[in-house]
Amino acid sequence: MLIIENLEIEIAIPIYLVENFVIKTVPNMHTVCNIRGVLEKNLGETILTDKKDMDIHIKYKGNTVFRGFVEEISIYSSADVHYFELKAYSYSKKLDNKEHTELFQNIEKTYGDLAREVVRRYSGDISNYNIKDKEIKGPVLCYKESAWAFAVRMASYIKTFLYPGMEYDKPHIHMGIHTGNMIEPGGIISESRDLIKKTENKSRIEYRLRTYNSYDIGDNIALDNKILTLYKKEVEFTKGELIFNFQGVEKSYIQDMIYPLENENIIGLSFMGKIKKYKDGKVYLRLDIDKKEPDYGFDWYPETGNVLYAVPDEGEKAQLYIAGMDTGDMYVVRTFGSKGSDENKKQLEVGKKSLTFSKEGISFIADDILTVNDRRFKLTGNGDVNISAAGKLTIKARNIRLNSKEEIVYISK
């Protein structure tokens, strides 16, 4: 541990001197800490691997100003003086390590509930502060998003921010801004005001404060007959001085700064699942991506266009199509009778993107369905379907039909 007056730095390397550090906390971002200094001795190359991910805890007057883990560290020596630089992040960054995919169908749950569920899957947790949570309007898809990114997106739907919590040596998130203290700023080095104009009739004042005193995000300050809430914080140690930089706005403007975030990657996706129930024109689907029992009945549009004629059976496979980014903008577009009684609808389902013919046999890898039986062979793709051969390709049938909505092009090379 290194102690500099009221400043304590707990870390598992022998620090002789800290030249400077900067800690930045802004909404919806992991807090980052950059430190430069001098070591008591050269720890050798093992520090580059052994000390990565080690805990670092910085306190001022006994209160935590940063808690996180070291992600990058470098050492260089000059005249037997061993300098180091390191970059550390709040433990919330651990929530970015893996991608998650799941469809949340229970519309009685709130956006905060969904964020907490996903975060807890990855050994994290969320505390709520002054949020106006609300139930989801329809099924919500988390598709290849980290737990942190998904939680940020859910927070945006209820017009609030996420902040990394630094109470523990594990991922913890604060959703919303806690109600802080009313402060009388002291030790002011400088202050400024920025007028930020959003539209002709709408603007806000951002207050910047540079001070020797430490405050918390969520604390309030009276200025120009307005109560401003501190929502950004930077801690700076340089030339032996510890300085705190803050930004504040009127709390009512914070919601105006937040816009719903969307996952653009979901548009046009389709997911296979099994029909568990068909009721009142709605299809209840257990998806292959998460294997959860269904809570929501989806509209569906059969390829025949005749909903009454093409009533799906329980146990059939079906495809859920994601039409847009809005909550619940999805429906069932087709069914496949792999478990039904119609022998013409037997199917083979496997993997991702190609159909291969070789001397070893035939292998099929696709997101869609290859239908095979004694009387027909059907290959359907959501996008392009390509069949190629190094030698001769023969197609033989009593009747051969080529049908195109736009054009048929013959190319000979």
Language-model regions: role of each:
Residues 46-58, 213-223, 316-318:
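Short coil-to-beta transition motif at edge beta-strands of beta-rich domains
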Residues 198-290, 298-302, 307, 321:
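Long, charge-dense accessory insertions within large macromolecular proteins
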Residues 154, 161-164, 212-214, 274-279, ...:
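Right-handed beta-helix
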Residues 44-126, 139-140, 155:
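Surface-exposed cap/loop segments at beta↔alpha junctions
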Residues 74-89, 236-249, 283-285, 342-346:
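Short, solvent-exposed secondary-structure boundary/capping segments
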Residues 83, 90-92, 130-194, 329-335:
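Short beta-strand-centered interaction patches in the first periplasmic/extracellular domains
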Residues 1-49, 89-93, 160-163, 167, ...:
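Juxtamembrane "anchor/assembly" segments of surface/extracellular structural proteins
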Residues 63-69, 226-235, 325-335:
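Short, Lys/Arg- and Gly-enriched loop/turn segments at beta-strand edges
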